[in-house]
């Protein structure tokens, strides 16, 4: 990275900081080469200008998704961009074609669900937000399009998330090209399910990671010619063998050892295991358990994973038996023997573990002991056996343990590959490399040397690829780049792998000599590489050496290099294990042909690893590479912590900064012409105002500035390092001058405004004073006027009160007089009205009773007469029964008569009921009146008695009074009054008695009349029942005849000629109607002279049946031929659906057990819609299918349902004719098809339902399926048509350069018109489909459903694209999409609710999201306002995504406040366990949103009467019933 060349006072810069790596500040002083800056933490620091880098103050607050878009591509800019994105949970960032993945240390399931895969499928690179799926998509599409293998290299240090990234890559690749594997498992599933097994045996706890992979893994996914996965293979590299025998605190050995020690008790007992602390290979470290990990559960999970990958129970037992043997082998210790340089087992404990180890390995314990402490040397003269000292014996033990474990791991890998299966015919692969990253610890040994050697090779490959991409970019833009050079690490690789003379070669050479030590090896390195720049010798060290790698200098300790490089294959060990009685153990050590000639063979791990690495590099070189760099943001493995120093070190080690250095060696800053002019156009406004080409304008601007060394490509401006800072400095100067001019004008304006305000205030003050004086004067005048008015009103009030009292008294007197007169008049009229009502009721009752008598007599006479006539006609019909034509006519007449008699019977019943009710009511009324009168008579008698008694007492008391006192006139008058009153009461009593007597007589007469009526009613009922039974018998006979005809017709269609030959009938057989025309054969009646047709020969029966079949086939062919054409519509009713329905109903096809007409109709529909793009045909059949389905839904019912026919009775006949007649009587045709022919088909609600057989019900189901299919095809066709337009509608096209300059209103108007062109295209497509379905009379219900789902699709596509593309979450783009949505809203208004329905409501997500983008003052909005008022539909994840991706490209405003963002993050953390709620993308619903019941409820009734038959069948006699019904309806 080149230091900046243009730093001025006031510039914002990045300065190195020991704690934060880089810290930003503002330059306050420049003193030569020293820069004084005030940092954000409040300190003032001094730094060399070469180590200071400019900061882009206009960078988006959320960072950029591709760091090549950074204005300043340097180390602090990259680090700051990653930190800002990580704070917003944006863990993926591009650097060109490289993906940087920062481990979030938390679950983010919404980033990896199926819907997210669908979004990235087919999307171009960089079109959506950075994602691991985008890298896999690029690799897959490159493989498909170019036919070349691809590879994805995933690297990073332990804990950076390499394994999870690899899993996501595998998932997505399997999603694109997955196939079913063994037992229904996909290849990807099998590869992923192998992970637990490989992790158990190849992962361990290290200082930096609790689950660190101690081996490299390269997964090859093999694809066939169709792009589908056909096989896979897992290849592993450099398992850390030394960890088996040696670990440091607080690390752990491989997981499998601890899992086995935590196995169930019976397992531990079988393997004689216990606490891990008891085993030497495990107790070298004090760490035995991992936090949050249950080793017992992990052990069971590992066993289940082994089952899944195909490892049998026996093999599993053998694997863990070998693991247990290694643990016991580690506890075998040695002591000095009696002889010199000899060794023996140390104690009985060692003996015990040796015996257990031998038992587990199924080998001889004595031979194992000899193999550990003895060596056999073969010379030409003799075989020499020598013993080993304790240290050598321990080394032999450890070598055996490492060899066994290494072979076991290799066997597991081979077993997994065999289980997955490989495709030898595959020509293309996608390889996923999950390998360890660059490592540098305090103590670095042979493992770190090999790992860093691997990373050097990969870095060389990476550098070549990055430089190649730079070259391709320069070549594409046609600029001069030949002088550009980049740093290569070839010298480091030569230092390591050069042969002879490299580190590995010298190490192998030292291992070949038994007397070599780590000191001699180190001295050899010092002598060989003393002049190499990349090799240094640390001071005060005799065994350490340092190599300057691309990621930094690493110091290695050579103490254990020799031991770790030796891969002993001791002949004694080989022979011991080959002789094992366990085939599994023996199979781990196959005897190779070259090993038979020598007892001991030396193998170098370094050389072998070098060959493996060379093979890997050859594989990678033959593929197109793609890079993913995983970064661990902190060492505490917790979310939301970003340690700058840790991350910057990983960026250096991962080659990201190396890629930046390569880019900086050429042209690190690349800007399109539009972006360059938009940013730096202020430096030369005259260039923008001129009508120049963009490239010419950029050249003129750069020439005016005087910049040198730049290059202009075809579409971009390429700037050298530091030139962007120089341009920004000049731009800042221009903007500063402009700001000062604006401030000067602003201050002048503010001063003028303040003066005007003061002047206005003075004027207002004066006006207020004068106004106050005027108000006081007005108030005095107002009070005087009010006093006068109050006096006037008071006097008026007193006078009015006096007047009102007088008026009230007068009215009261008048009211009393008028009320008395009115009450008298009312009483008189009430009495008169009551008398009139009584008279009217009595006369009405008498007249009504007489009328009822006459009516009943008439009905009885009519019923008797009609019954007699019916019996007479029945006898006549029986005589003519053999005549088929006469029988049919008689049947029709009898049907009429039956209906009429039924009506009469029902009328008689109703009259009888009404008569009984009237009689009951009359009787109740009479009883009530009689009771009332009786009570009145009793009260009158009691009153008379009381009055007589009072008169008697008065008379008895009268003489003494007369004697004692003079006779007074008043007493005489009172006596006379009492006497007259008594006489009046007597007369009233007599009248009441007379009335009661009259009522008794009337009641007796009514009872007598009631008895007579009851008798007459019983007689009438008995006659009606008899008549009803006669009618039913006639109906049964007619139905039997009809049933026989129907059965004979069915038998004629079903039975074979042979069976018809065997059948003999003694009964007569009537010629049946054909189901095609409903008439009798030959147009009339055929009878023999004796009115019967005897069945004597088979041929006489075959001829009419053959004719029936042929006629039926002809009619069906004609119908199918007719409906295969476009029959159009009769009004708003589809002709084809109505014709099909009427034909099927007339032919009774719904009621037959076997027919082919349904299959032929379905086949016709299927043939018509074979072309999925013909929307005209699809809309035509959508209308017909819906109408026909509606008719079937309202007509058919399943067989066995309750019949609606009231005359149906169960029959006990067990004969075939009886059962058939019973079934036929349950159908509406049993009442007489002639009734339908005569009356025609009326509204569907007036028709009775048909008991449908299985073929009819199946036809209805097939028709429903075809309706759903046609609906889906129309909907999907419209989706396909608008999908490309939606991709253009989500982002506003860039405006022309004219919009950058003021005074271009006309050009802006033209540009604005062009902006909505895509939206108008969508509107045009919607109108086209709407008009098409209107023209074909598609049901509005289905049209609404189509457009509702289409608008939902638009909502999903626009909303998801908005959330996945940061460039779309801008203010101007929100305005653009809002204008487009207004077009769709206008379309909904024009389409009306009948066809658009609730389609506009389906856009609620994108409407609210766009509304959020275009609102002002977002930082002032609270979270409650946003969630409740602005965006109530959007989830918190969606709001967080929009808020963090928003950027204002128009006014430069910011998104919501940091507090709102923090609250959103808290709410998301609370919902982190809910995978559904974590997803911020929407799903498109492609289901069928309606049922048959919905169609039946939503569609109007269809009247099929007035449908005119098509010309093709109009003149055919077989379809005459269509014309007959039409004529009947018109008449």
Swiss-Prot record:
GO molecular function: actin binding; ATP binding; calmodulin binding; cytoskeletal motor activity
Domain (Dilute) ranges: 1159-1470
Keywords: Actin-binding, ATP-binding, Calmodulin-binding, Coiled coil, Cytoplasm, Motor protein, Myosin, Nucleotide-binding, Phosphoprotein, Repeat
The keyword Transport belongs to this UniProt entry's keyword annotation: no
GO cellular component, one term: myosin complex
Composition bias type Polar residues, residue spans: 1076-1090
Residues the record lists as binding ATP: 156-163, 209-217
Annotated InterPro entries: Dilute_dom (IPR002710), IQ_motif_EF-hand-BS (IPR000048), Kinesin_motor_dom_sf (IPR036961), Myosin_head_motor_dom-like (IPR001609), Myosin_N (IPR004009), MyosinXI_CBD (IPR037975), MYSc_Myo11 (IPR036018), P-loop_NTPase (IPR027417)
Coiled coil: 884-1056
CDD domains xref list: MyosinXI_CBD (cd15475), MYSc_Myo11 (cd01384)
PROSITE patterns recorded: DILUTE, IQ, MYOSIN_MOTOR, SH3_LIKE
Chain spans, region Actin-binding: 495-529, 531-554, 589-613, 613-635
All residue ranges annotated as the Myosin motor domain in the record: 62-732
Residues with the Phosphoserine modification: 1517
Disulphide bridges, residue numbers: none
Domain IQ: 758-787, 783-812, 806-835, 831-860, 854-883
Phenotype seen when the gene is deleted: Impaired growth of root hair cells, twisted shape of stem trichomes, and irregular size, branch positioning, and branch expansion of leaf trichomes. Affected organization of the ER network and orientation of the actin filament bundles. The double mutant xif xik exhibits aberrantly enhanced organ bending, including increased gravitropic root bending XI-F. The xif xik abcb19 triple mutant has a stronger bending phenotype than the double mutant xif xik.
Family: Belongs to the TRAFAC class myosin-kinesin ATPase superfamily. Myosin family. Plant myosin class XI subfamily.
Protein role: Myosin heavy chain that is required for the cell cycle-regulated transport of various organelles and proteins for their segregation. Functions by binding with its tail domain to receptor proteins on organelles and exerting force with its N-terminal motor domain against actin filaments, thereby transporting its cargo along polarized actin cables. Involved in the tip growth of root hair cells and in the elongation of trichome stalk and branches. Plays a major role in trafficking of Golgi stacks, mitochondria and peroxisomes during root hair development.
Oligomer and partners: Homodimer. Interacts with MYOB1, MYOB2 and MYOB3. Interacts with PHOX1 and PHOX2.
Official protein name in the record: Myosin-17
Lineage, highest ranks first: Eukaryota, Viridiplantae, Streptophyta, Embryophyta, Tracheophyta
């Amino acid at each position: 990275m080149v230091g900046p060349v243009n730093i001025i006072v006031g510039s914002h810069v990045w300065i190195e900081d020991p704690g934060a790596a880089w810290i930003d500040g503002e330059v306050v002083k420049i003193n030569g080469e020293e820069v004084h800056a005030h940092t954000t933490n409040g300190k003032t620091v001094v730094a060399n200008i070469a180590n200071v880098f400019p900061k882009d103050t206009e960078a988006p607050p959320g960072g950029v998704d591709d760091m090549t878009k950074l204005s300043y591509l340097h180390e602090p800019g990259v680090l700051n961009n990653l930190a800002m994105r990580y704070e917003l949970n944006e863990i993926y960032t591009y650097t060109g074609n490289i993906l940087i993945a920062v481990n979030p240390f938390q679950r983010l399931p919404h980033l990896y669900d199926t819907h997210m895969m669908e979004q990235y499928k087919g999307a171009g690179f960089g079109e959506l937000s950075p994602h691991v799926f985008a890298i896999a998509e690029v690799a897959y599409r490159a493989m498909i399009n170019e036919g070349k293998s691809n590879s994805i290299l995933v690297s990073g240090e332990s804990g950076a998330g390499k394994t999870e990234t690899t899993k996501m890559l595998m998932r997505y690749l399997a999603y694109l090209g997955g196939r079913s594997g063994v037992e229904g498992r996909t290849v990807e599933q099998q590869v992923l399910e192998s992970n637990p097994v490989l992790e158990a045996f190849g992962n361990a706890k290290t200082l930096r990671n609790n689950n660190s992979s101690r081996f490299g893994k390269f997964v090859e996914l093999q694809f066939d010619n169709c792009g589908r996965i056909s096989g896979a293979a897992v290849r592993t590299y450099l398992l850390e063998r030394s960890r088996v025998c040696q670990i440091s605190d607080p690390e752990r050995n491989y997981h499998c050892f601890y899992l086995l020690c935590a196995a169930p008790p019976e397992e531990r007992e079988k393997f004689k295991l216990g606490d891990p602390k008891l085993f030497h290979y495990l107790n070298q470290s004090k760490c035995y358990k991992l936090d949050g990990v249950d080793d017992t559960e992990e052990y069971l999970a590992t066993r289940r994973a082994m089952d899944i990958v195909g490892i049998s129970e026996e093999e599993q037992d053998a694997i863990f038996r070998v693991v247990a043997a290694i643990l016991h082998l580690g506890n075998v210790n040695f002591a000095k023997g009696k002889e010199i340089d000899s060794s023996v087992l140390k104690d009985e404990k060692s003996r015990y573990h040796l015996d257990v180890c031998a038992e587990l390995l199924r080998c001889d314990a004595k031979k194992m002991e000899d193999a550990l402490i003895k060596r056999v040397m073969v010379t030409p003269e003799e075989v020499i056996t020598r013993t080993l000292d304790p240290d050598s014996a321990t080394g032999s033990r450890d070598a055996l343990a490492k060899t066994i474990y290494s072979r076991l791991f290799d066997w597991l890998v081979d077993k997994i590959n065999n289980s997955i299966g490989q495709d030898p015919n595959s020509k293309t692969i996608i390889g996923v490399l999950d390998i360890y990253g660059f490592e540098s610890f305090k103590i670095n040994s042979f493992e770190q040397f090999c790992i860093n050697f691997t990373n050097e090779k990969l870095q060389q490959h990476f550098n070549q690829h990055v430089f190649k991409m730079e070259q391709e970019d320069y070549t594409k833009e046609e600029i001069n780049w030949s002088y550009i050079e980049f740093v290569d690490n070839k010298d480091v690789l030569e230092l390591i792998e050069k042969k002879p003379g490299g580190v590995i070669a010298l190490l192998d050479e030292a291992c070949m000599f038994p007397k070599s030590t780590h000191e001699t090896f180190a001295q050899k390195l010092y002598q060989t590489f003393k002049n190499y720049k990349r090799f240094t010798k640390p001071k005060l060290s005799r065994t350490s050496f340092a190599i300057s790698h691309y990621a930094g200098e690493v110091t290695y300790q050579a103490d254990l290099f020799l031991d770790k490089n030796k891969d002993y294959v001791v002949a004694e060990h080989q022979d011991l294990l080959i002789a094992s009685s366990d085939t599994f153990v023996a199979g781990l050590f196959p005897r190779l042909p070259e090993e038979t000639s020598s007892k001991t063979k030396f193998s170098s791990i370094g050389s072998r690893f070098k060959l493996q690495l060379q093979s890997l590099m050859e594989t990678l070189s033959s593929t197109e590479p793609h890079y993913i760099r995983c970064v661990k943001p902190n060492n505490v493995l917790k979310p939301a912590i970003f340690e700058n120093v840790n991350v910057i070190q990983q960026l250096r080690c991962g080659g990201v900064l190396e890629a930046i250095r390569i880019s900086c060696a050429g042209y690190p800053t690349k800007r399109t012409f539009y972006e360059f002019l938009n940013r730096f156009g202020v430096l030369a406004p005259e260039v923008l105002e001129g009508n120049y080409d963009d490239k010419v304008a950029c050249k003129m601007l750069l020439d005016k500035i005087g910049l040198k060394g730049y290059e202009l490509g075809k579409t971009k401006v390429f700037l050298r390092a530091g030139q962007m800072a120089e341009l920004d400095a000049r731009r800042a100067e221009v903007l500063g001058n402009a700001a000062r001019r604006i401030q000067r004008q602003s201050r002048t304006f503010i001063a003028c405004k303040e003066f005007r305000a003061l002047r206005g205030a003075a004027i207002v003050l004066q006006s207020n004073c004068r106004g106050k004086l005027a108000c006081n004067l007005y108030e005095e005048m107002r009070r005087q006027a009010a006093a006068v008015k109050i006096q006037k009103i008071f006097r008026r009030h007193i006078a009015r009160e006096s007047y009102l009292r007088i008026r009230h008294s007068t009215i009261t007197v008048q009211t009393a007089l008028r009320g008395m007169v009115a009450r008298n008049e009312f009483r008189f009229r009430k009495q008169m009205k009551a008398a009139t009502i009584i008279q009217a009721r009595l006369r009405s009752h008498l007249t009504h009773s007489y009328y009822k008598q006459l009516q009943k007599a008439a009905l009885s006479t009519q019923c008797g007469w009609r019954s007699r006539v019916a019996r007479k006609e029945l006898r006549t019909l029986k005589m003519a029964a053999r005549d088929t034509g006469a029988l049919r006519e008689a049947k029709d007449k009898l049907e009429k008569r039956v209906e009429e008699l039924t009506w009469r019977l029902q009328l008689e019943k109703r009259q009888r009921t009404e008569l009984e009710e009237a009689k009951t009511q009359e009787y109740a009324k009479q009883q009530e009146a009689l009771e009332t009168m009786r009570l009145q008579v009793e009260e009158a008698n009691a009153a008379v008695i009381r009055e007589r008694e009072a008169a008697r007492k008065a008379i008895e008391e009268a003489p003494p009074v007369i004697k004692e006192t003079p006779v007074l006139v008043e007493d005489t008058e009172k006596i006379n009054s009492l006497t007259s009153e008594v006489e009046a009461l007597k007369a009233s009593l007599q009248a009441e008695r007379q009335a009661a007597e009259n009522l008794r007589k009337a009641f007796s007469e009514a009872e007598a009349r009631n008895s007579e009526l009851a008798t007459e009613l019983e007689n009438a009922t008995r006659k009606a029942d008899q008549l009803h039974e006669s009618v039913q018998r006639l109906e049964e006979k007619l139905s039997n005849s009809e049933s026989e005809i129907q059965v004979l017709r069915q038998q004629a269609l079903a039975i074979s000629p042979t069976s018809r030959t065997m059948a003999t009938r003694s009964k007569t057989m009537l010629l049946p109607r054909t189901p095609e025309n409903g008439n009798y054969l030959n147009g009339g009646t055929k009878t023999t002279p004796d009115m019967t047709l005897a069945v004597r020969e088979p041929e006489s029966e075959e001829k009419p049946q053959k004719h029936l079949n042929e006629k039926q086939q002809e009619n069906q062919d004609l119908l199918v031929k007719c409906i295969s054409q476009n029959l159009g519509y009769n009004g708003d009713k589809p002709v084809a659906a109505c014709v099909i329905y009427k034909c099927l109903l007339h032919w009774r096809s719904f009621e037959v057990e076997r027919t082919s007409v349904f299959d032929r109709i379905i086949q016709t529909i299927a043939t018509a819609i074979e072309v999925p793009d013909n929307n005209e045909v699809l809309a035509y059949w959508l209308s017909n299918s819906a109408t026909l389905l509606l008719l079937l839904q309202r007509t058919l019912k399943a067989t066995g349902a309750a019949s609606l026919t009231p005359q149906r009775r169960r029959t006990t006949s067990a004969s075939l004719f009886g059962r058939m007649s019973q079934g036929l009587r349950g159908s509406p045709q049993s009442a007489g098809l002639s009734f339908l022919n005569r009356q025609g088909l009326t509204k569907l609600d007036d028709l009775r339902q048909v008991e449908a057989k299985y073929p009819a019900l199946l036809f209805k189901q097939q028709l429903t399926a075809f309706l759903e299919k046609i609906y889906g095809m129309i909907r999907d066709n419209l989706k396909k048509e608008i999908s490309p337009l939606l991709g253009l509608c989500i982002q506003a096209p860039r405006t022309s350069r004219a919009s950058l300059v003021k005074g271009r209103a006309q050009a802006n108007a033209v540009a604005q018109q062009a902006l909505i062109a895509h939206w108008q295209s969508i509107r045009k497509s919607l109108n086209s489909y709407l008009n098409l379905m209107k023209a074909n009379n598609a049901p509005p219900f289905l049209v609404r459903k189509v457009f509702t789902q289409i608008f939902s699709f638009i909502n999903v596509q626009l909303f998801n694209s908005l959330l996945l593309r940061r460039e779309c979450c801008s203010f101007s783009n929100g305005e653009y999409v809002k204008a487009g949505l207004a077009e769709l809203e206008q379309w909904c208004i024009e389409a009306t609710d009948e066809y658009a329905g609730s389609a506009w409501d389906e856009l609620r997500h994108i409407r609210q999201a766009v509304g959020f983008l275009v609102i002002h003052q977002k930082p002032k909005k609270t979270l409650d306002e946003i969630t409740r008022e602005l965006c109530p539909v959007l989830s918190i994840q969606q709001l967080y995504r929009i808020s963090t991706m928003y950027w204002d490209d128009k006014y430069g405003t910011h998104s919501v406040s940091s507090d709102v963002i923090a609250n959103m993050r808290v709410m998301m953390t609370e919902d982190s366990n809910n995978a559904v709620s974590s997803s911020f993308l929407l799903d498109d619903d492609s289901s069928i949103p309606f049922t048959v019941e919905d169609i039946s409820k939503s569609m109007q009734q269809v009247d099929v009467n007035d449908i005119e038959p098509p010309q093709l069948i109009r003149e055919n006699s077989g379809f005459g019933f269509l014309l007959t019904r039409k004529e009947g309806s018109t008449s």
